[in-house]
Amino acid sequence: MSPAPHLVPRPHQIEASEAILAARRAGRPGFLLGDLTGLGKTLSAWLALSAMPEEEILVICPKGAIPQWRLTMAQAGLPAKSVTLMNFERTKTLMAPPAVSTKRSTRARNNELAKLGTPKRVWPLVVIDEAHRIRNPNSQQGLVCRQMAAAADFTLYMSATAGQAPHELSYLARLLVQGGDRRKGEGLGADLDGFRALMKRLGIGRAKGRWKNWSWEPNEDDRRTMSFLLYKGPNAIGLRRRPEEIAGWPEVQREITPTALDAESRRLYEATWREFRRELGLAGGSTRRAAGWAADLRFRQKGSLIRIAGTADFADDLIGNGQQVAISVAFLETSALLVEKLRGHGWRVDAINGTQSGERNEAVRLAFQRGELDAVVFTVTEAISLHRGEMPGGERERSLVVHDMRHSAIQLQQIEGRCHRDGQRAVIYYAYAENTVEEKIAATVIGRMADMDGMAGDDTAMLDAIAGVIEEAAEAR
């Protein structure tokens, strides 16, 4: 198959690449590219990387993003480089184990490898795409990625959702902390200590003891402070733009869409709701406790299955009006049944999910992008492009239906960017069962998504708001 047309960078992508290069010229150890999902961060990054003198580059990214990186590099028309593409799950292969080990279990050896191992080789340029994945400094992937970044001359961090709370940004310590902690190759402990000192100096949160015990109460003053440090201050370490700030870029259009329940589905839903209320009461009345959270998850999964027919009917209408439809779901069983239901209606449908190989998922994605599928049902939240006009045959209007509401602003923002991206508009429909607690949850989510700035605390605030809605409804009905 012949390659797609040559990629032409847009002005905002050139601006991003110039900001990255300016940080490099200023001697900074890295840069945070925080543009919202759909603004083409991959091409922005590659424009900058291709202009740097180093030939060898390590790109660490989600497995599903590897095809996009390959496509961007192939179609950008820029000088070739020696690029190693590595997904997060394979990063341990980058490390050599310590000379002596007494660990016996696989888990213990892997932890030791990530913490005490040394890089088998060093790349001068490192990219960490979807960098929020390494926000836990004690995770195996986080430890390895931070070591590779520490050994590099320059590291580019890419994430539209850098962290839910300020202390989750410790992976950016070398960029944020002045002085010795920014020196190439220093220990990771110095990074965390330096970041801890920064948080204490700024009076943000409680940074005492082990990282997992750090805490923070969302507030606007801290959000403004972090925004200043990350993106808006004169010495900001990164760049972040929203789609509506880009000239000619379509704004996100969100709609809440009620789906009807027939008599039997209504009976099942109400029985499921009663069972949830009973379990929640036994759990102390809060979804923020482990038992309450588990009860909430069971309720959402059962509700997801009950609503399949309504979502299929809604997708019927969209496809019948000449559109292609991407449907986001949270559960594999829902995915399989939705595909079966829509195929039964005569549509060409397939799925993208974590049970399939990367090659299979990419084949489904390409079929959708070429217009060979009417709908695709997907469980992933990041690293795939399902927007209109990427390939010949994919010119139909697109709609995104969120069948399963996530209780995370970060996940929802990532999901929204699967279709509404690269300057292509896609209406985003949040589906819910009418006359149920889901109606108020959907309204709460839409309101908060419209106002969110993607900075620290958005995800926590949304989770608390949704929990409040559910708990209030459980007590009242």
Label for each model-derived stretch:
Residues 1-32:
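Conserved pre-motif I regulatory segment
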Residues 27-47:
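Walker A/P-loop
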Residues 42-75, 163-168, 330-333:
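Conserved Walker A/P-loop ATP-binding site and its immediately adjacent core
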Residues 125, 142-245, 425:
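Conserved P-loop NTPase motor "coupling/switch" region that bridges the ATPase
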Residues 242-348:
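Conserved helicase/translocase motor-coupling segment
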Residues 324-328, 337, 343-380:
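Conserved helicase ATPase core of P-loop NTP-dependent helicases/translocases
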Residues 381-414, 418, 422:
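Conserved RecA-like helicase motor core of SF1/SF2 enzymes
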Residues 407-477:
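A conserved SF2-helicase RecA2
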